[in-house]
A protein has these predicted regions:
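Nucleotide and nucleotide-moiety/phosphate-recognizing core
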Residues: 1-110, 119-134, 141-146, 153, ...
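Short glycine/threonine-rich catalytic loop with a Thr-x-Gly-x-Asp
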Residues: 112-114
């Protein structure tokens, strides 16, 4: 069965480098790592495909980014999952997480949306929260800054210096989850 790896984010250049789009940044990192080009799919998504592993043990992987806004992600991703006959047990969603320090990554299956509109849309569209989540820590804003404004801002200069390593680790987590499973991935990468 095909794995569907989804990076949550918002479309457009004005959002591309924001904290809220860190999931899509990891998708782009995976695309570079596997030397694939993205194309537009009829489900209103941008996708790229590759094989992870070798021979009979290779996994088919579709990288996906919705072309709509974060809170509308579920519909296009569900259409894509139906197209590839992928059920939620083979879907990995990468998203920004305020409640985890910048650079830390945690992986789980299922759970609540913690107020994240992209996860709300996914769960509503699929009728289940039982997909995998790779929670990419962006930390909380300092002082009185509104979290909704914070996630739509670019990373700070010190964070930008660490971002390439963070995105590379995010890509490693995706590959580990597909090849090694949840428990091995959690024990190796959850921080």
């Amino acid at each position: 069965m095909t794995w569907l790896v989804v990076g949550l984010g918002n479309p457009g250049d004005q959002y591309a480098a924001t904290r809220h789009n860190v999931g899509q940044m990891v998708i782009d990192e995976l695309g570079k790592r596997h030397n694939v080009k993205f194309s537009t799919h009829k489900s209103r998504t941008s996708i790229a495909a590759f094989k992870l592993g070798f021979g009979v043990d290779a996994h088919s992987v579709i990288l996906a980014k919705s072309l709509g806004y974060m809170n509308e992600t579920g519909g296009p991703i569900k259409a894509l999952a139906q197209f590839y006959s992928t059920d939620p047990s083979k879907i990995i969603v990468l998203h920004d997480e305020l409640d985890i320090d910048f650079g830390a990554i945690r992986t789980k299956q299922g759970g609540g949306d913690n107020g994240h509109n992209g996860l709300k849309s996914m769960t509503s569209s699929f009728g289940t929260p039982d997909y995998f989540r790779i929670r990419l820590g962006i930390g909380r804003p300092m002082g009185q800054q509104d979290p909704a404004d914070f996630v739509l801002k670019q990373f700070s200069q010190p964070e930008k210096k660490e971002l390439p390593l963070f995105l590379d680790r995010g890509a490693d987590v995706v590959e580990s989850l597909i090849e090694k499973g949840l428990e091995v991935t959690q024990s190796r990468f959850n921080s």
